[in-house]
């Protein structure tokens, strides 16, 4: 059933208390004997809320220690790329992870601009690092990299998320996440085997390296996107990052490729006070939801379409997108993805081999 306030602007009563959410991250200690308070990996890592004692400092300490132990057993000897999105709990968890990783002797690469990092950007950093000189991907051998993304994706502002990307650059398979979760839950009840140093010490360590995620990612886009076609088309594009990690990537794309993509709402607000309410009565930054996107659609229908031919949206970690069209609104993702697939496999990619 759709909530009565679905699609309506968020009110003060809908907003989180950021100080409370962060405070409980540090102050509340989970009980490993309570199932709801244990580490549990889903399809995209461990998720929860500090307000429900399901995403607290102890969880991240235990998970990160388990990851450090796992990558050592798996022979992953290269750097670990770590990024975070714009949720209130993401920066505290990011700091906690760095404390544990450095204490375990893991070489960590963080954003040189101290900026938010989309999930695809961390994946691309891992894949390019692990690429051989002949262009093939390496999944075994010395010096391979892996990563962590601190994000609960498009979930509400109260939530936190923490996911591990192995050397393949994508989500870890079930056998890996199960092993990490099992070890993390062992540690959750006994921190004697956890290594950790204060953040101020960790971030100054030689093990922490600054890496320009944004420049590295944007520079690689020309290898997969024909920007000449976009420029010559004259199409007027807008993008709404929905207060997420992609917000500062679009201006660099404009600068580097001479584009004119307009960032519709560039603000970052951990309460997401500018959102409209999703179908279940919660604030949720889902660019494929017509309820969550109604604020954007309404502003476009009230005259902003004069500036755009097409507008897109991305969720907080920018691995989910939505498309808004004039006289239609939010498109069904399955519909336009089907059209894209038909186009790509219909002979429009001459560089692709027949067996692709």
Predicted regions and their residues:
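Accessory alpha-helical/coil subdomains and C-terminal extensions
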Residues: 191-195, 255
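Glycine-centered structural positions embedded in regular secondary structure
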Residues: 64-68, 100, 146-147, 161, ...
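Ferredoxin-reductase
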Residues: 2-15, 75-168
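An N-terminal, well-structured beta->alpha segment
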Residues: 2-103, 128, 207-237, 245
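Phosphate-binding chemistry for phosphorylated carbohydrates and sugar-nucleotides
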Residues: 12-15, 20, 24-27, 107-123, ...
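Flexible hinge/switch segments at interdomain interfaces of large molecular machines
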Residues: 33-43, 195-198, 263-269
């Amino acid at each position: 059933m759709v909530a009565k306030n679905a699609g309506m602007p968020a009110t003060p009563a809908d907003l989180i208390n950021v100080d409370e959410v962060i405070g409980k991250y540090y102050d509340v200690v989970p009980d490993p004997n309570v199932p709801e308070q244990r580490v549990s990996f889903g399809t995209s890592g461990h998720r929860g809320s500090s307000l429900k004692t399901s995403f607290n400092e102890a969880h991240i300490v235990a998970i990160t220690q388990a990851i450090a132990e796992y990558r050592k057993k798996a022979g992953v000897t290269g750097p670990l790329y770590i990024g975070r999105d714009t949720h209130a709990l993401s920066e505290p968890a990011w700091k906690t992870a760095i404390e544990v990783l450095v204490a375990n002797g893991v070489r960590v690469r963080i954003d040189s601009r101290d900026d938010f990092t989309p999930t695809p950007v961390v994946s691309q950093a891992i894949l390019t690092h692990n690429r051989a000189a002949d262009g093939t991907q390496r999944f075994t051998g010395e010096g391979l990299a892996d990563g962590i993304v601190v994000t609960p994706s498009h979930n509400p502002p109260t939530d936190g998320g923490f996911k591990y990307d192995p050397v393949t650059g994508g989500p870890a398979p079930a056998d890996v996440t199960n092993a990490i979760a099992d070890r993390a839950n062992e540690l959750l009840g006994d921190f004697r085997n956890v290594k950790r140093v204060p953040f101020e010490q960790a971030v100054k360590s030689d093990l922490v390296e600054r890496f320009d995620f944004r420049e590295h990612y944007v520079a690689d886009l020309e290898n997969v996107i024909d920007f000449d076609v976009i420029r010559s088309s004259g199409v007027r594009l807008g993008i709404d990052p929905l207060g997420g990690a992609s917000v500062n990537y679009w201006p660099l794309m404009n600068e580097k490729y001479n584009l004119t993509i307009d960032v519709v709402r560039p603000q970052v607000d951990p309460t997401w006070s500018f959102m409209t309410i999703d179908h279940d009565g919660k604030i949720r930054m889902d660019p494929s939801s017509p309820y969550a996107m109604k604020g954007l659609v309404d502003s476009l229908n009230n005259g902003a379409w004069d500036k755009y031919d097409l507008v897109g949206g991305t969720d907080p970690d920018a691995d989910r997108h939505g498309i808004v069209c004039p006289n239609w609104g939010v498109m069904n993702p399955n519909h336009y993805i089907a059209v894209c697939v038909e186009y790509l496999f219909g002979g429009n990619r001459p560089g692709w081999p027949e067996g692709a």
